[in-house]
Regions:
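Acidic/polar-rich alpha-helix caps and helix-coil junctions
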Residues: 1-78, 114, 118-303
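Glycine-rich (often Gly-Gly/Gly-Pro-rich) flexible segments and glycine-rich loop motifs
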Residues: 78-80, 84
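Short, cationic low-complexity segments
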Residues: 84-103
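Hydrophobic helix-coil surface modules that form long, contiguous segments used
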Residues: 98, 106-108, 113
Length: 303
């Protein structure tokens, strides 16, 4: 699956391609790698999207590669960092939320999407081990639409939160899925659209049916429209699962600028006091600098 992702990146970045291979060659290579996994029959979609993130359905038939997390091994503080503030009895910092513009864009496409409640949370009663605000409501956007401060202006990302509200440890035991079958289906939909092999709608329909949705108009127009729709679908399905940077950038700076940076910076609900203005300087947003320590010690790096 990882090799298919590499071929997809190469297909959309001519400066990285081997001179002997064309864009379509790379799409075909990606298709072969992804299709082999699909045809193996080893994986399938779980019926309940939320079960992928509640700790009760680990190493499921949908999981292709999954990190094994153990509270006793103290090998992950994901839950502490992602669990909303005072959502559980202790060690709930809620450092990571989702930009309100991302939530709004999702709801605009799929207002009845079954993925919404598993992905975002904005309304709950506080749990804090008996503190004075125990049981008080805590509401952020969109439940609290005022967006009066940064603390309530964006929904929390709920996928990686600890779901046991009595939990007090800074570590927990919820595994982290790196690659899953739904991602593979979206990849095959994107690849098939580029190859124009007629298979694209079938793959994305499998993913959408689980969420109670059907392909929207963007999937039914033309090749360019389908491309934009499937790139959005990665975000709706996989938000916060570690692939956002890769998917947002792999079609190049111009696509990233139009469909991520400008979409956020120019959205009608942008509020300077609580929204971050995204940097649009290509040299600063497309590449990560090589650390000086690596430059000084890795003799295999070119000058």
């Amino acid at each position: 699956m990882l090799l298919a992702k590499v071929y997809m990146l190469l297909a959309t970045n001519p400066e990285l391609q081997d001179a002997s291979l064309s864009e379509m060659d790379y799409w075909n290579l990606a298709y072969t790698e992804a299709k082999d996994i699909y045809m193996s029959g080893d994986y399938s979609l779980e019926s309940d999207y939320a079960s992928l993130f509640d700790g009760t359905n680990e190493n499921s038939d949908e999981s292709i590669f999954e990190l094994q997390i153990s509270q006793d091994a103290t090998n992950s503080q994901m839950a502490r960092n992602y669990t909303p503030w005072r959502y559980k009895a202790g060690q709930a910092f809620g450092w990571f939320s989702v930009s309100a513009s991302v939530y709004d864009y999702h709801v605009a496409h799929y207002p009845t999407d079954l993925r919404l409640d598993a992905t975002y949370i904005s309304d709950y009663t506080q749990r804090c081990g008996g503190c004075e605000t125990e049981g008080n409501p805590h509401r952020t956007y969109p439940t609290n639409s005022s967006r009066g401060s940064f603390g309530n202006a964006h929904p929390y990302l709920f996928k990686h939160a600890e779901k046991d509200r009595t939990h007090t440890n800074q570590f927990n035991s919820q595994n982290l899925i790196i690659y899953r079958y739904a991602d593979l289906l979206l990849m095959l939909a994107e690849i098939s659209n580029e190859l124009e092999n007629g298979e694209e709608l079938g793959y994305v329909t499998e993913v959408l049916e689980r969420s109670g949705q059907i392909p929207h108009a963007g999937y039914l127009a033309d090749k360019d429209s389908f491309r934009d729709a499937i790139m959005d679908e990665y975000r709706f399905e996989l938000l916060g699962e570690g692939l956002d940077s890769y998917n947002n950038r792999r079609r190049g700076y111009a696509y990233f600028l139009e469909n991520t940076i400008n979409r956020h910076n120019n959205n009608p609900n942008f509020k300077a006091s609580v929204d971050v203005l995204l940097n649009d300087v290509e040299s600063e947003v497309m590449l990560l600098e090589i650390p000086l320590l690596e430059i000084n010690n890795n003799e295999l790096l070119n000058d």
